[in-house]
Amino acid sequence: MRLSPHEQERLLLSYAAELARRRQARGLKLNHPEAVALITDHVLEGARDGRSVAELMASGRTVLTRDDVMTGVPEMIHDVQVEATFPDGTKLVTVHQPIA
C-alpha cells in the first residue's frame, strides 16, 4: 500500500486521536499532543460527514474540558487550525480556545 505524505499525516493523526481516546477512557488526563490530535480528528471527521465550518468551529470547543487534560494544557492551546476536506472543497477550520 502506498500512501502520499498527506495521507500518511492523516493516518498518523487518526492513530494519535485513537490512542488519546483509549487513554481518556482509562481515566487518564491528556497531554498537549493528545488533546490537539483529538480536536483535529473531530474536525476532520466532521468535515467528512458534511458538517459546516461554523458548526465544526463551535463543536470543536466542546470536545475537551479542563478536567480532561493535564494542568497547563488549556493555556498552551490558543487555536487549533485544521485544513479539512469538505464536499465542496478544502477549507481552513480554526477552533479558538478549544479547551474551556
UniProtKB/Swiss-Prot annotation:
Its main location: cytoplasm. One of its GO terms (molecular function) is urease activity. Its EC number is 3.5.1.5. The keyword Signal does not apply. Pathway: Nitrogen metabolism; urea degradation; CO(2) and NH(3) from urea (urease route): step 1/1. Keywords: Cytoplasm, Hydrolase. It is found in: Cytoplasm. Coiled coil: none annotated. It catalyses: urea + 2 H2O + H(+) = hydrogencarbonate + 2 NH4(+). The keyword Hydrolase applies. Gene3D superfamilies: Urease, gamma-like subunit. GO terms for cellular component: cytoplasm. GO terms for biological process: urea catabolic process. Heterotrimer of UreA (gamma), UreB (beta) and UreC (alpha) subunits. Three heterotrimers associate to form the active enzyme. Belongs to the urease gamma subunit family. This is Urease subunit gamma. It comes from Nocardia farcinica (strain IFM 10152). The gene is ureA.
